[in-house]
């Protein structure tokens, strides 16, 4: 088993444990949606998840996808990214990171820069806020759009 596949399986197991600890029943569809999100590096929309899973789950609906994404979001294992167009994208991530977003095609790429975590501490110190989180987006043109 490859290291990436082991990581996906480990994250899936941890997420299923979190869901169960919150009283959520694990269905085959719910598990498939979660596994797709964990393995995806594209920050998919609900429609993209539906397109990917509907061949294996012919009875799945877009509403089922949205309902499960809401459950995952409420528990904190998925983040909704309401960037750009009217379709939110969804991100499975268990660590802090930022997003670089293509202004032309909407592609979102993860960007890790741990030094920015200090921003929260400084903001809290300077403002006396109890800082809970922060979000940063960087915009530009991805390589594919530059080459067009």
From Swiss-Prot:
Pfam families: FUR (PF01475)
Region annotation DNA-binding: where it falls in the sequence: 1-84
Gene3D superfamilies, per the entry: 3.30.1490.190, Winged helix-like DNA-binding domain superfamily/Winged helix DNA-binding domain
GO biological process: negative regulation of DNA-templated transcription; regulation of secondary metabolite biosynthetic process
Residue numbers binding Zn(2+): 102, 105, 142, 145
Localization terms from the record: Cytoplasm
Family matches, as CDD domains: Fur_like
Domain of life, per lineage: Bacteria
Recorded GO MF terms: DNA-binding transcription factor activity; transcription cis-regulatory region binding; zinc ion binding
One Gene Ontology CC term in the entry: cytoplasm
Keywords: Cytoplasm, DNA-binding, Manganese, Metal-binding, Repressor, Transcription, Transcription regulation, Zinc
Function: Manganese-dependent repressor that controls a regulon of oxidative stress resistance and iron-storage proteins. May act as a hydrogen peroxide and organic hydroperoxide sensor.
Family affiliation: Belongs to the Fur family.
Protein name as it appears in the record: Peroxide-responsive repressor PerR
Lineage: Bacteria, Bacillati, Bacillota, Bacilli, Bacillales
């Amino acid at each position: 088993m490859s290291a990436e596949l082991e990581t996906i399986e480990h994250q899936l197991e941890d997420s299923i444990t979190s869901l169960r600890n919150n009283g959520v029943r694990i269905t085959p569809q719910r598990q498939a949606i979660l596994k797709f999100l964990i393995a995806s590096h594209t920050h998919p929309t609900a429609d993209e998840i539906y397109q990917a899973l509907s061949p294996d789950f012919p009875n799945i609906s877009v509403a089922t996808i949205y309902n499960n994404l809401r459950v995952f979001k409420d528990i904190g294992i998925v983040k909704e990214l309401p960037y750009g167009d009217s379709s939110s994208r969804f991100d499975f991530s268990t660590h802090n990171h930022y997003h670089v977003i293509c202004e032309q095609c909407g592609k979102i790429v993860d960007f890790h820069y741990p030094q920015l975590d200090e921003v929260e501490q400084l903001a809290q110190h300077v403002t006396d806020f109890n800082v809970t989180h922060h979000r940063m987006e960087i915009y530009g043109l991805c390589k594919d759009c530059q080459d067009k």
